[in-house]
Amino acid sequence: MKKIVCVAIVGKGNNPLFIQDFSSSITDENKLKLHYIVHCSLDIIEDKPGSNKKLPSDMYLGLLYPTEDYKVYGYLTNTKIKFIIVVLDTSDIKDSDLKLFFKRLQTLFINTTSNPFYKPNSKVESKKFLQEVTNLVPSL
């Protein structure tokens, strides 16, 4: 059973760059709920005291908030790109594993957006990126 239900990357203007659901039994209603959860987490990231720090060690924001079914975790880069993952509430995940996952996800994002054909601050539509993220999800 996969622990990660959704992975989202949001730009500095709070525009979605990448949102992907990873639950095989997700309905359209649940998909909409996940998008809503990701959107709500943006306010929490902005209000988080650590979100204004510039140190690389402070990029991991930890648990943003729990819902009935999910836990939402965040990661904020120094360029204000937000990485958000939604996991099942029943999942017991260590912070060290989450930090490693976010760093790997950020590396994939950097490699993809470093492409000269990528238009900055636009949706990531690369099939290769989607496949790499899909391969990364079971590692948590």
From Swiss-Prot:
It comes from the Eukaryota. InterPro entries: Longin-like_dom_sf (IPR011012), Sedlin (IPR006722), TRAPPC2L (IPR044760). Gene3D superfamilies: 3.30.450.70. Pfam families: Sedlin_N (PF04628). One of its GO terms (biological process) is endoplasmic reticulum to Golgi vesicle-mediated transport. Signal peptide: none annotated. CDD domains: TRAPPC2L. GO terms for cellular component: cytoplasm; nucleus; TRAPP complex. This is Trafficking protein particle complex subunit 2-like protein. Belongs to the TRAPP small subunits family. Sedlin subfamily.
